[in-house]
Amino acid sequence: MAKPIEVHDSDFAEKVLKSKTPVVVDFWAPWCGPCRVIAPILDKLAGEYAGRLTIAKVNTDDNVQYASQLGIQGIPTLVIFKDGREVGRLVGARPEAMYREIFDKVLAMA
């Protein structure tokens, strides 16, 4: 079963911006309680959406470049990219159903 991929500042452009499939980037930190709450949800969804959508994780403690460039001020923040452009953003922990709804909308975009 697919899992979220780890992304660092050094490979963000390659793994996220140049991806052929939409990418949901989870900006998180190990000390963040809500981040730990949504981690198993994102693990599950990574498997269910494998091949159609990629879920990536960026540890903001270790990778500040893109978090800063994208104006990430609170975590968890999920930023959704399609064709190298930001098409959506969610700040804070949300229920699994909301993630599914948003991921499905992104996949339905032309």
Curated annotation (Swiss-Prot):
Described purpose of this protein according to its UniProt entry: Participates in various redox reactions through the reversible oxidation of its active center dithiol to a disulfide and catalyzes dithiol-disulfide exchange reactions.
Disulfide pattern: 32-35
Gene: trxA
Keyword Electron transport tagged: yes
Keyword annotations of the record: Disulfide bond, Electron transport, Methylation, Redox-active center, Transport
PANTHER family: GEO12009P1 (PTHR45663:SF11)
Gene Ontology CC annotation, any one: cytosol
Residues with N6-methyllysine modification: 105
Gene3D superfamilies cross-referenced by the UniProt entry: Glutaredoxin (3.40.30.10)
Record-level GO BP terms: cell redox homeostasis
Protein name listed in UniProt: Thioredoxin
Modified residue annotations for N6,N6-dimethyllysine: 105
Family (UniProt): Belongs to the thioredoxin family.
Source organism: Chloroflexus aurantiacus (strain ATCC 29366 / DSM 635 / J-10-fl)
One term of GO molecular function: protein-disulfide reductase activity
Domain Thioredoxin: residue ranges: 3-108
InterPro entries in alphabetical order: Thioredoxin, Thioredoxin-like_sf, Thioredoxin_CS, Thioredoxin_domain
Keyword Lipid biosynthesis: no
